[in-house]
Amino acid sequence: MLKIGPYEMESRLLLGTGKFDNEEIQTKAIEASGTDVLTFAVRRMNLYDKNLPNPLANVNLKDFVTFPNTAGAKTVDEAIRIAEIAKHAGVCDMIKVEIIGDDETLLPDPIATYEACEILLERGYIVCPYIAEDVVLAKRLEELGVHAVMPLASPIGTGRGINNPLNLSYIVKNANVPIIVDAGIGSAKDAAEAMELGADAVLLNSAVSRAKDPVKMAEAMKLGIEAGRLSYEAGRIPVKYTAQASSPSEGLGFL
């Protein structure tokens, strides 16, 4: 069971809803993923004008926890304003704080993110910041009172997988809030690796929506995350630098 603030989810896969070729594929991929949480950029949603296109028109949002994000924000004020729009529209009081600090790499701005989280927490939001794989920042945000921390695997949309498994493992080890690996996942292998490192969940979008077969990839991600979590809970064998026979040595005297 994944718990973020007051929200409880069976699935540890959080799915982004953008970049699908059409609504039919999007709907089938959501179903195949088994997710309980759908995340979306507030600026993409027409929250006040029902006459404008709605990218989630065919999805019964009552079946999911909706998880808006502040994608597109470059300043603290922009992130706060986007969060307020989502809350006032009755979408959800849980917000992914995403403030981009560099247009080329799309890496998050750590200072602005911290400041925005501080304000949103004071206003009663369930706050989940998106950050680089910064061990110290992750801990400082937890101490601030955020409800989950969302370190990237690699830059948004690159599909490079986990660039810094060591830092992610440090973040997980030191955490007392859920750690959700977010951005850069390219395959089910990457998702499984994140879970094997001890992450509580994985958030992904492009890896599914831009796959050759998004529906199959959604199912693959579901299974990869489940396998990775089971592997983490089972406990892998220690890494050794010398070979160790797996067959018993007893009985060799009879040969």
UniProtKB/Swiss-Prot annotation:
GO cellular component annotations of the record: cytoplasm
Enzyme Commission (EC) number: 2.8.1.10
GO MF term set: thiazole synthase activity
Pathway assignment: Cofactor biosynthesis; thiamine diphosphate biosynthesis
Keywords, comma-separated and alphabetical: Cytoplasm, Schiff base, Thiamine biosynthesis, Transferase
Compartment annotation: Cytoplasm
Catalytic EC class: transferase
Domain of life: Bacteria
Alphabetized InterPro entries for the sequence: Aldolase_TIM, Thiazole_synthase_ThiG, ThiG
Protein residues bound to 1-deoxy-D-xylulose 5-phosphate: 157, 183-184, 205-206
Record field: catalytic activity: [ThiS sulfur-carrier protein]-C-terminal-Gly-aminoethanethioate + 2-iminoacetate + 1-deoxy-D-xylulose 5-phosphate = [ThiS sulfur-carrier protein]-C-terminal Gly-Gly + 2-[(2R,5Z)-2-carboxy-4-methylthiazol-5(2H)-ylidene]ethyl phosphate + 2 H2O + H(+)
GO biological process, one term: thiamine diphosphate biosynthetic process
Subunit structure, interactors included: Homotetramer. Forms heterodimers with either ThiH or ThiS.
Family stated for the protein in its record: Belongs to the ThiG family.
Name assigned to this protein: Thiazole synthase
Organism of provenance: Staphylococcus carnosus (strain TM300)
